Curated annotation (Swiss-Prot):
Superkingdom as given in the UniProt entry: Eukaryota
Activation/inhibition comment: May be regulated by calcium ions.
Membrane-spanning parts: 340-359, 371-401
Residues in compartment: Mitochondrial matrix: 50-339, 402-443
Gene Ontology CC terms, in alphabetical order: mitochondrial inner membrane; mitochondrion
Keywords: Ion transport, Magnesium, Membrane, Metal-binding, Mitochondrion, Mitochondrion inner membrane, Transit peptide, Transmembrane, Transmembrane helix, Transport
Subcellular location(s) of the protein: Mitochondrion inner membrane
GO molecular function, one term: magnesium ion transmembrane transporter activity
Organism: Pongo abelii (Sumatran orangutan)
Family: Belongs to the CorA metal ion transporter (MIT) (TC 1.A.35) family.
Protein name in UniProt: Magnesium transporter MRS2 homolog, mitochondrial
């Protein structure tokens, strides 16, 4: 009863409280319910304690704060448990390989990067963050530091042979890398760019023979009709070629963006800013920015060659498409011409068939009595139809013939001889004047 009496005083205060605090208080009030068989004194004490809790606004704030604190703890624990785990493969300067798993939060804290820097993107890019080089190549992500190379999440990829056989030897200097005398990041960048160029070259070498074989089969003049299965294969190969052209274009644009900015070239030389000895060598004679520019220009040239080869294939596909359309148009013209010839034959036959219609009427004449009249009339009908059909075909042939090129008007022989004689006279006059002048000058 005391609790009920205090409700009118507490309602205005409760309306000002947030909804979460009210829910917490409601759960607190209903969590411990007194038993039904409790004594009256115990019920009275419980009612007074609940009323005292309701009457103290400070307790309300504390309860709300405790509830919010518990919620934040639970959310942080949930986020920590759901944080992605990277499988990291580490390569040092000597080519030693170590693999381990690390959470994303721990990894970017160790590297001094932001969370957005380790976000996966399917677009090729080369960026520098906090003296770290981040290279993204569709499904491959690498972080290059002055001391090591980190490959992130190579799982479910066919990279084991390249990662564990070729890459360590290239980084340690045993491979055929041009940048072996330069700092470690040059070798790492060259190895990754070489791998990506080889991947694009492999895709092109697979597509090129398939496309050429399909085009040869479609453009072959021995086949009068076009095979639909070959067209479907050509369509699929054309889509793959378009994807390859897009990959090459993105690769070229990403490298060209770095080549256009001198600051980016300087930032890619991470050992220059972390190692004093490398900085002294760069200041003394070896310009690392120029070496990086030459390296990127070399791979840009290789990508440009791949782009030209892919463009040639695209031109061949377009030319073959026009040839296929021409062949289809010629076949369609042949069918239309045949249809027109049959129509003219039907017209000529029906025109002379009127003679048979006249004999089929119920008219009496003396011609039916002669047995030779039937064969005579039939012969006249077929001969007349054949003659008219031939005339119509000759008319159609004259109309469909290609027009001859205009003939050039030929000059008569007399004018040509006159022109030659005039040229000879002029040359003789010039020679005579020249000899006379020479004699005068000698005298």
């Amino acid at each position: 009863m005391e609790c009920l009496r205090s409700l009118p005083c507490l309602l205005p205060r409760a309306m000002r409280l947030p909804r979460r605090t009210l829910c917490a208080l409601a759960l607190d009030l209903t969590s411990v319910a007194p038993p039904v068989a409790a004594s009256g004194r115990r019920a009275n004490l419980i009612g007074r304690s609940r009323a005292a809790q309701l009457c103290e606004p400070g307790r309300l704030r504390v309860a709300g704060e405790v509830h919010r604190f518990r919620t934040s703890d639970v959310s942080q624990a949930t986020l920590a448990s759901v944080a992605p785990v990277f499988t990291v493969t580490k390569f040092d300067k000597q080519g030693n390989v170590t693999s381990f798993e690390r959470k994303k939060t721990e990894l970017y804290q160790e590297l001094g990067l932001q969370a957005r820097d380790l976000r996966f993107q399917h677009v090729m890019s080369i960026t520098v963050r906090n003296n770290r080089i981040i290279m993204r190549m569709e499904y491959l992500k690498a972080v290059i530091t002055p001391e090591c190379l980190l490959i992130l999440d190579y799982r479910n990829l066919n990279l084991e042979q390249w990662l564990f056989r070729e890459l360590p030897s290239q980084l340690s200097g045993e491979g055929q890398l041009v940048t072996y005398p330069l700092p470690f990041e040059f070798r790492a960048i060259e190895a990754l760019l070489q791998y990506w160029i080889n991947t694009l070259q492999g895709k092109l070498s697979v597509l090129q023979p398939l496309i050429l074989e399909t085009l040869d089969a479609l453009v072959d003049p021995k086949h009068s009709s076009v095979d639909k299965s070959k067209l479907h294969i050509l369509l699929q190969n054309g889509k793959s070629l378009s994807e390859l052209e897009t990959d090459i274009k993105i690769f070229k644009e990403s490298i060209l963006e770095i080549l256009d900015e001198e600051e980016l070239l300087e930032e890619l030389c991470v050992s220059k800013w972390s190692d004093p000895q490398v900085f002294e060598k760069s200041s003394a004679g070896i310009d690392h920015a120029e070496e990086m520019e030459l390296l990127l220009e070399n791979y840009y040239r290789l990508a440009d060659d791949l782009s030209n080869a892919a463009r040639e294939l695209r031109v061949l596909i377009d030319d073959s498409q026009s040839i296929i359309f021409i062949n289809l148009g010629s076949h369609r013209n042949v069918m239309m011409r045949l249809n027109l010839q049959l129509t003219m034959g039907t017209f000529s036959l029906s025109l002379f068939g009127l003679m048979g219609v006249a004999f089929g009427m119920n008219l009496e004449s003396s011609l039916e009595e002669d047995h030779r009249i039937f064969w005579l009339i039939t012969g006249i009908m077929f001969m007349g139809s054949g003659l008219i059909w031939r005339r119509l075909l000759s008319f159609l042939g004259r109309q469909l013939e290609a027009p001859l090129p205009p003939m050039m008007a030929s000059l008569p022989k007399k004018t040509l001889l006159a022109d030659r004689s005039m040229e000879l006279k002029n040359s003789l006059r010039l020679d005579g004047l020249g000899s006379g002048r020479s004699i005068l000058t000698n005298r």
